[in-house]
Amino acid sequence: MREIPLNPVPNQRLQITIDDNRWDLTIKVARNMMVCDIRRNDEVVMLAIRATTDAPLIPYNHLASAGNFVFITERDALPWYEEFGKTQSLVFWGPDD
């Protein structure tokens, strides 16, 4: 498992490489919730997936074979950018975790 650093800003993009896979994440505000776009090696995995707590962002096993992401929050609060790095974090876990 690996924690992915997030900035407490409403819209952000980040790119990380894990186990020879390049992940591009876009996290943005959509009304009163956060949504995520996920690409792996330039291929779309998920678009505008709602960010929830303690549930994988990639809900389908066949799309998550190279790993998955989950928001960890206090008291099961929905992910919100103002809490990133304080009470909320994003973690990646690979197939061997």
Q: Which residues make up each language-model segment?
A:
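Short, charged/polar N-terminal "headpieces" of proteins
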Residues: 1-26
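Generic structural motif
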Residues: 9, 21, 30, 41, ...
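Acidic, aromatic-enriched beta-alpha/helix-loop junctions
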Residues: 31-73
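Acidic, low-complexity intrinsically disordered segments
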Residues: 55-97
